[in-house]
UniProtKB/Swiss-Prot annotation:
SUPFAM superfamilies: YjeF N-terminal domain-like
Protein's organism: Paramecium tetraurelia
Database matches in PANTHER family: NAD(P)H-HYDRATE EPIMERASE
Annotated GO CC locations: mitochondrion
Keyword Endoplasmic reticulum attributed: no
Cofactor note: Binds 1 potassium ion per subunit.
Biological role: Catalyzes the epimerization of the S- and R-forms of NAD(P)HX, a damaged form of NAD(P)H that is a result of enzymatic or heat-dependent hydration. This is a prerequisite for the S-specific NAD(P)H-hydrate dehydratase to allow the repair of both epimers of NAD(P)HX.
Protein name per UniProt: NAD(P)H-hydrate epimerase
Domain YjeF N-terminal stretches: 15-218
Catalytic activity: (6R)-NADHX = (6S)-NADHX; (6R)-NADPHX = (6S)-NADPHX
Keyword terms, alphabetized: Isomerase, Metal-binding, NAD, NADP, Nucleotide-binding, Potassium
Bilayer-crossing regions: none
Amino acid sequence: MQQLNKISYLNQIQSQQFDVELMSEEVGFTLDQLMELAGQSIANTVVQLNKEGKSYNKILVLCGPGNNGGDGIVSARHLKQFGLQPEIALFREVKNPFFNRLLNQCKYNLIPIHYELQDLEKYDLLIDAILGFSFKPPLREPYDKPIQQLKTTKTPILSVDIPSGWDVEQGNAQDFFTPQYLISLTLPKLGVKSFKGRHFIGGRFIPLKLQEKYNFIVPEYQGSDTILELSNL
């Protein structure tokens, strides 16, 4: 477990610039690679919670239109391969060829895909991958209703990178839902610094040259682990 005050936090501009640099010709990552690594980290977090005694078997992954949603779709495929029962909730038809490839992978893994609101209480765990660090208010259709559902549900929630609707720098400024769990990707965002739930981090791939260039304080993963729990001590 790593202390929260011994790690770098990113604001919105830094988060966006860092993604761009990772996928630059010089650094060489592709969006496919980054989503695969992120999705596996999300799934590994669920596995870790189950190892501790939770019974998160039937899981709904709520996915938005951006990279956060793509991470969620990939996580569903990994969860299925891990023997769990994920389902995906999208809230509009997907026209992006890249996303459709990810969805086809899930269809071939027999993962149910929904395009309408679901009864959240019939699931053991919800994965919130609706909106990411690029979100700017106000909430718009069709994502306003599922995010309101997350505020009232009794089913535990694992948010991806930042809870949907939160400001990447100011946090839950508009009083949206607060999840029980959070998995930050690469480095945590400023807006989750005061998060009180269980906070994990994944995305163990920050190149050493970029760590030095930006003077990042990065997570101290153990052995071959791909996730790490952060402590607020």
